[in-house]
Swiss-Prot record:
The keyword Phosphoprotein applies. Sn-glycerol 3-phosphate binds at T14, R84, E85, Y136, D246. GO terms for cellular component: cytosol. InterPro entries: ATPase_NBD (IPR043129), Carb_kinase_FGGY (IPR000577), Carb_kinase_FGGY_CS (IPR018483), FGGY_C (IPR018485), FGGY_N (IPR018484), Glycerol_kin (IPR005999). ADP binds at T14, R18, T268, G311, G412, N416. Pathway: Polyol metabolism; glycerol degradation via glycerol kinase pathway; sn-glycerol 3-phosphate from glycerol: step 1/1. The gene is glpK. This is Glycerol kinase. GO terms for biological process: glycerol catabolic process; glycerol metabolic process; glycerol-3-phosphate metabolic process. ATP binds at T14, T15, S16, T268, G311, Q315, G412. Keywords: ATP-binding, Glycerol metabolism, Kinase, Nucleotide-binding, Phosphoprotein, Transferase. Glycerol binds at R84, E85, Y136, D246, Q247. The modification Phosphohistidine is found at H232.
Length: 500
C-alpha cells in the first residue's frame, strides 16, 4: 500500500513563519510556528534580517515533520504565501543580503515616494500598476537600498545583485539558487510591474534607475518553479508549485473564483479583496487595483481596500485601556451593553486607510455620556471595525458596478460572533465564515496542489472549504442607515480635527 501524500504550505508572515501540512480534504494535519525579531533602527522604520526569516522557515519545516511523523517524500508539493512588499536585495554569488529586508510597514522610504508625487507621476504609476504612490510598495525600498549601501547601484548594474520579495527569497534559498522567480500577485505589489501588459515596466524602472537585471522572472501562481535542494528538505526534492501574496492566497483559499466574490481577512488590520475577473478595473475612489491570481493561462484582477486598524483595536482595549484581559472577552462585554446611545470610536491610531488615505488622522471617540459604560465602549470599538469594512465595500460596489451579495470572512476577529452579526447588519448582506479559518495557507496549498495534479481542478476544490457559519442581516433599513450616517459624520470630524 502506497503512503498517503500531502501538500505543505509555508506561510511567511510579518512576525512569524509557519509550515502547515494539509491532506487531500484540505484538512490541517500538522503545523509549526516560529517568531523572529523585528528591527526598528529609527522611529517609523521596520526591518527584518532576511537570514533570520530563512532560518525560521527551516525550523518550521522541521517542526511540521516532527509533529506529524510525515516523511519529506510524502510531500507532493510546496506552496508559499508571504507578507507582501517586503524587500530583500542579496549577493548573487554568496547568497547574503546586502542590507536588512525593508518591511511593508516601514516609512523610511517616504521621501522617495513624496518626490515622485511632487514630480507629477501619480497618474502614470496608477495607470500602469494600479497602485497609489506610497512607501508601502517595493519600488521605493529597492531605490533606498541601492542609494544607501555603498557600491550597490554599480553592482546591481553589473548583474551581481538580485532583488526579491519574500516569496522570491524563499524559493531561491529552497532551490539553492536554481530559481529566481516571483508570481503575478507579488509582482503586482512592487509598483514596478505593468499589470495590464504583464511585464516589468521599462518606463518606471528608468524613472527610478532600477536595473532590470536584478528583477525575478514573473510566473503564474500555480506552476512548478523549481524543486527543493535535497539538503534543504531532509533529502526530499519536492516541487515548489504554488505562490501568492498573503491576501491573494486568502482570496483563493476562500474559493472566490467568480467576479464579484469578496473576502475580508480580519487580522491586525483588515484586507478586503474583490475578484473583478479578467478585466482590469482602475479604481476612481482610492482603492488599489491589483492581480488576484493567474492560473491556467488566465489572469484574474482584483480591487483591494486596506484598513489599518481592525483586530489591533481589540488589542488596544486589552493592552492600552486594560478594559479586557483577553481578546475573546470583548464579545461577552459587548453583548452585556444595554445602551442604544450612538457611540462611535474611530480607531485612526496610525491614520485612516482606504478609502480615505489620511495619514494625519488620529483616533477619536464621539457620543459619550455620563451613562456610558465599559460594555458600551467595547461594543462601539468592535462596531468600528464593521463600519470601516462598509466604507470599503460601498466603494468597491461603486468602482466595480457589481452588487455584492456576500462577504467571505476569515482571520482571528472573524471568530467574534457579535462582530460578524453587526457586520452583516450594517452591510445588509450575508457574511459567510469559513469552516477552516486557515484560508491563507490553504490558498497556497491549493495553488501548489493544482499544479501537480494533487487536486484536479477548481471545481474539485469547491467542496473542501465549506462555510462554517452564515450570518444574515436582521437590522431594519432605517436603523442601519442612521447608524452609518453617524459613523460618516464621526470620520469627517476626525479628519477635520487632523487638519493643520
Amino acid at each position: 500500500m502506497s503512503e498517503e501524500k500531502y501538500i505543505m504550505a509555508i506561510d511567511q508572515g510579518t512576525t512569524s513563519s509557519r509550515a502547515i501540512i494539509f491532506n487531500k480534504k484540505g484538512e490541517k494535519i500538522a503545523s509549526s510556528q516560529k517568531e523572529f525579531p523585528q528591527i526598528f533602527p529609527q522611529a517609523g522604520w521596520v526591518e527584518h534580517n532576511a537570514n533570520q526569516i530563512w532560518n525560521s522557515v527551516q525550523s518550521v519545516i522541521a517542526g511540521a515533520f516532527i509533529e506529524s511523523s510525515i516523511k519529506p517524500g510524502q510531500i507532493e508539493a510546496i506552496g508559499i504565501t508571504n507578507q507582501r512588499e517586503t524587500t530583500v536585495i542579496w549577493d548573487k554569488k554568496t547568497g547574503l543580503p546586502i542590507y536588512n529586508a525593508i518591511v511593508w510597514q516601514s516609512r523610511q522610504t517616504a521621501p522617495i515616494a513624496d518626490q515622485l508625487k511632487e514630480d507629477g507621476y501619480t497618474d502614470l504609476i496608477h495607470e500602469k500598476t494600479g497602485l497609489v504612490i506610497d512607501a508601502y510598495f517595493s519600488a521605493t525600498k529597492i531605490r533606498w537600498i541601492l542609494d544607501h549601501v555603498p557600491g550597490a547601484q554599480e553592482r546591481a548594474e553589473k548583474g551581481e545583485l538580485l532583488f526579491g520579495t519574500i516569496d522570491t527569497w524563499l524559493v531561491w534559498k529552497l532551490t539553492d539558487g536554481a530559481a529566481h522567480v516571483t508570481d503575478y500577485s507579488n509582482a503586482a505589489r512592487t509598483m514596478l510591474y505593468n499589470i495590464k501588459e504583464l511585464k516589468w515596466d521599462e518606463e518606471i524602472l528608468k524613472l527610478l534607475n532600477i536595473p532590470k537585471a536584478i528583477l525575478p522572472e514573473v510566473k503564474s501562481n500555480s506552476e512548478v518553479y523549481g524543486k527543493t535542494a535535497a539538503f534543504h528538505f531532509y533529502g526530499g526534492e519536492v516541487p515548489i508549485s504554488g505562490m501568492a501574496g498573503d491576501q491573494q492566497a486568502a482570496l483563493f483559499g476562500q474559493l472566490a473564483f467568480e467576479p464579484g466574490m469578496v473576502k475580508n481577512t480580519y487580522g491586525t488590520g483588515s484586507f478586503i479583496i474583490m475578484n473583478t475577473g479578467e478585466d482590469m478595473q482602475l479604481s476612481e475612489n482610492n482603492l488599489l487595483t491589483t492581480i488576484g491570481y493567474g492560473i491556467n493561462g488566465k489572469v484574474y484582477y482584483a480591487l483591494e481596500g486596506s484598513i489599518f486598524i481592525a483586530g489591533s483595536a481589540i488589542q488596544w482595549l486589552r493592552d492600552g485601556l486594560r478594559m479586557i484581559e483577553t481578546s475573546p472577552e470583548s464579545e461577552a462585554l459587548a453583548l452585556a451593553s444595554t445602551s442604544d446611545d450612538e457611540i462611535y470610536v474611530v480607531p485612526a491610531f496610525t491614520g485612516l486607510g482606504a478609502p480615505y488615505w489620511n495619514s494625519n488622522a488620529r483616533g477619536s471617540v464621539f457620543g459619550l455620556t455620563r451613562g456610558t459604560t465599559k460594555e458600551d465602549f467595547v461594543k462601539a470599538t468592535l462596531q468600528s471595525i464593521a463600519y470601516q469594512v462598509r466604507d470599503v465595500i460601498d466603494t468597491m460596489q461603486i468602482d466595480s458596478g457589481i452588487d455584492i451579495q456576500q462577504l467571505r470572512v476569515d482571520g482571528g476577529a472573524a471568530m467574534n460572533n457579535l462582530l460578524m452579526q453587526f457586520q452583516a447588519d450594517i452591510l445588509g448582506i450575508d457574511i459567510a465564515r469559513a469552516k477552516n479559518l486557515e484560508t491563507t495557507a490553504l490558498g497556497a496549498a491549493f495553488l501548489a496542489g493544482l499544479a501537480v495534479g494533487y487536486w484536479e481542478d477548481l471545481d474539485s476544490l469547491k467542496e473542501l472549504n465549506e462555510t462554517g457559519q452564515l450570518f444574515k442581516a436582521s437590522m431594519n433599513e432605517s436603523r442601519k442607515e442612521k447608524l452609518y450616517k453617524g459613523w460618516k459624520k464621526a470620520v469627517m470630524a476626525t479628519q477635520i480635527f487632523a487638519e493643520e
